[in-house]
Amino acid sequence: WYLSANLKSKLSLNNHLLPGLEPLGVPKGLRNSVLPFKFNDFYDLEKNVKKKAKYCAAIVIEPCREKLPSKKYLKELKKIAKQNNCVLIFDEITSAWRTSTSGIHMDIGVYPDVAVFGKTIANGFAMGAIIGKKKIMQNATKTFISSAFWTERMGPSCALAFIKKHKQLNIGKILIKKGKKIKNIWYKAAQNAGLDITIQGIDPLASFKLNIKDWRTGATYFIQEMLKKRILASDRCYANYMHTDSLIRKYELACFEIFKKIAELEKNNKLSQSLEGPPKQMDFGRLTN
């Protein structure tokens, strides 16, 4: 359903979340069935969402990714959904469990009609969960839903154990603390190397970009040199409970060293020559306003 937005124009999603997507294999009958809108943008809310909501069955958004949204914006979105009898759905697959033992909408204080969870909810095991208001969820009983895994217990068991442990250890608070440390490492390493840096994301879901001539090459070099130190890293970091102080310290030393190398190579126009393979592919990008 998401890709169907690009049936009308291949550029429909370029300023949304995932630019560079081809709607291959998507039935043409879904053309005009999805209308993208800009997240946390009040102008677009007035111009498009309010006008088109009456034609829609649901409004689906991620409540947060790169940064926390305006609470006022989410409240207005909820108001529009209610006025037009739309179901407001929050995709919490990425944002949940990062800052507290629940979806991030609980921290923001705006509650959707339906929320979707996955991945982290079972700490990596295959598990998903959909929660919502009774009058909406009951409609699922009128549809055909089948599965070969009705009696599978691993996913639910892992999810219950994860949620219990998450709450017991206050993991959200820990992830925020670790994420702040990582962001600070990037900032200080860039300052030390004389590089300009852009850091984005909420603390547990952070990313960085060194503002050099060719960041695609720079990011590839960073990954390459980190691998040599037996560190699997990229230009983003999803904070983890098992990121111990000693591991973070090892990562810090590596960042200082590699950022300095990038600065030197960039200065001497030798960064691309220092790659031991092709630069990372960036055709399938992820951008969030």
Task: Report each predicted region and the residues it spans.
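PLP-dependent aspartate aminotransferase-fold enzymes
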Residues: 1-55
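Conserved PLP-binding catalytic core of the aspartate aminotransferase-like
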Residues: 179-183, 187-223, 273-288
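PLP-dependent enzyme catalytic core of the Aspartate aminotransferase-like
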Residues: 167-169, 177, 228-289
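Active-site PLP attachment segment
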Residues: 1, 108-140, 151-158
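Conserved PLP phosphate-binding loop immediately N-terminal to the Schiff-base lysine helix
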Residues: 58-73, 86-108, 114
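Active-site core of PLP-dependent enzymes with the aminotransferase class I/II
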Residues: 41-47, 63-84
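Structural signature of PLP-dependent enzymes
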Residues: 162-187
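A short glycine-threonine-serine/GTX helix/turn-capping micro-motif
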Residues: 46, 142-152
